[in-house]
UniProtKB/Swiss-Prot annotation:
Protein function: Binds and deliver cytosolic copper to the copper ATPase proteins. May be important in cellular antioxidant defense.
Domain notes: The heavy-metal-associated domain (HMA) coordinates a Cu(+) ion via the cysteine residues within the CXXC motif. The transfer of Cu(+) ion from ATOX1 to ATP7A involves the formation of a three-coordinate Cu(+)-bridged heterodimer where the metal is shared between the two metal binding sites of ATOX1 and ATP7A. The Cu(+) ion appears to switch between two coordination modes, forming two links with one protein and one with the other. Cisplatin, a chemotherapeutic drug, can bind the CXXC motif and hinder the release of Cu(+) ion.
Stated family: Belongs to the ATX1 family.
Name assigned to this protein: Copper transport protein ATOX1
CDD domains, alphabetized: HMA (cd00371)
GO biological process terms, semicolon-separated: copper ion transport
Residues that coordinate or bind Cu cation: C12, C15
Span of domain HMA: 1-63
Family annotation (InterPro entries): Copper_transport_ATOX1-like, Heavy-metal-associated_CS, HMA_dom, HMA_dom_sf
Record PTM N6-acetyllysine, positions in chain: K60
Length: 68
């Protein structure tokens, strides 16, 4: 399964919970959230566009850092 790394503007536990919520709702993903470094690593067959769109539902600034 491809692994992708994203930067997400998370400042607190609530922010990371929002990321977890939208990714779990999408399904078909395994992910690790690195709150101090504001990064999310996602293992998924979904396209980068779908993952970006999903992460943007949190209302946070999101950018794709590349394959991990």
């Amino acid at each position: 399964m491809p692994k992708h790394e994203f930067s997400v503007d998370m400042t607190c536990e609530g922010c990371s919970n929002a990321v977890s919520r939208v990714l779990n709702k999408l399904g078909g993903v395994e992910f690790d959230i690195d709150l101090p470094n504001k990064k999310v690593c996602i293992n998924s067959e979904h396209s980068v566009d779908i993952l970006l769109e999903t992460l943007e539902k949190t209302g946070k600034a999101v950018s794709y850092l590349g394959p991990k």
